[in-house]
Amino acid sequence: MNDREFRVVGLRRTGNHAIINWILQQVDGTVVFVNDIFINENPFRTVVEVFESQDPDFYWRANRIKSNPLYAGEDYLDNLRKEANRDFIPKDLLIFSLEDYRLKLMDVKRYQKRHLLYFGNSKEKTDILILRDPYNLLASRLKNERIGLKTRSYLKPFADV
């Protein structure tokens, strides 16, 4: 069982990682950060599959979790497999981020049930919602993607702004 769990929710380019990194610097003990999870997939199983397949499109993303001491060293894959198979390693703090999800998708019973299967239980749970000024968010996304306004589906809601 985890002592604490932070679920961080925000749109891409809202400063999620800056805030999460700030939190990580404030906490001692066993801390695990799972970045940009998919709501309907076991994030640990996904990471294990990526490492085993060495898919270059996703390897860089999964490789970040190896920076955590819990998954470092030669047995990192064994520890990740334990987590994927619901043999959870106790953590002082578990942080996971969700990016570009509608909030109402996270309150349904199906999500809550899967959450327990994927992460186990935590004594204390905290939701963190990160907001950013919509004009700055749009400008950041456009600059980061170097794309036209109508080419990405997540930018279309801003087209009328």
Label the predicted regions.
Residues 1-88:
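PAPS-dependent sulfotransferase catalytic core
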